[in-house]
Amino acid sequence: MTSNSEILEVQDADRVRTLTMNRPDALNAFNGALYAELAAALRAAAEDPAVAVVLLTGRGRAFSAGTDLVEMAELVAGGGDAGAGTEEHGFNLLVDALIAFGKPLVAAVNGLGLGIGVTLLGYADLVFATEGARFKCPFTSLGVAPEAASSYLIPQLVGHQNAAWVLMSSEWISAQEAREMGLVWRLCAPEDLMAEATAHATRLAALPVSSLRAVKRAMTEPHARRVAEARQRENRMFAELLGGPANNEALAAFAEGRRPDFASLPDGS
């Protein structure tokens, strides 16, 4: 299967389906359409007997810059919900699809990853990244809460203190730091990333899908309840903070091209 929409490219070879996020001018930031298309593509791959493994990457210099802040600001200004607390929003559709995806998921991080561009890696079975990749979870700098059960999955991957820094600091993490923490499995030169990730995905895809599914289920099923509980907590906290003083200041600062001033906000914000 080869199918290219404007924002998500799909290509099959050797039982590996490669999904390439294709909003390079927006650094592959997730708007509602990309959330929905990637969720649908994962569901389709899960049901397709010709697919054994999915490989996810991005076009251009970014893996994904996270949620599209322009769209978030428009939703907040209009009194809407940017998604983490809304069942029908594409964000939750994507997280549902990631949780339900029962085949191996390989990520090839081709550049920077922010927000959901980091937290979705908690659902990947193997993560490859270029040596120049960088990672950031900017939740506190946006005045919001974690997402996608990252408050549970990231500590599972990297340990409590590393996770606390990643989730609380809103600072960049280098590819080398991500590898040392356990967020990334292999680092590659940029020109070798896709060949390396594809080679490993193809080796997995040559094995019985039934056995691959069984291994993944055995590894993930013990965590299912805690992932669901983490999502509920995060969605509630995200909804409470979205459109609040800190989030409004962060979005205003982004629109105005300045640093946010959280110190001047009311106590407790």
Give residue ranges: language-model regions.
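Amphipathic alpha-helical segments at domain termini/boundaries
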Residues: M1-T18, N22, E171-A205, R213-H223, ...
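Conserved CoA-thioester-binding segment of acyl-CoA-metabolizing enzymes
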Residues: M1-R59, D96
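Crotonase-fold acyl-CoA enzyme core
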Residues: D96-L212, R236, E240, G244, ...
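Short, hydrophobic secondary-structure boundary micro-motifs
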Residues: A29, V54, T86, V166, ...
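Glycine- (often His-adjacent) and acidic-residue-rich active-site loop
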Residues: G58-A97, G113, S141-G143, R226
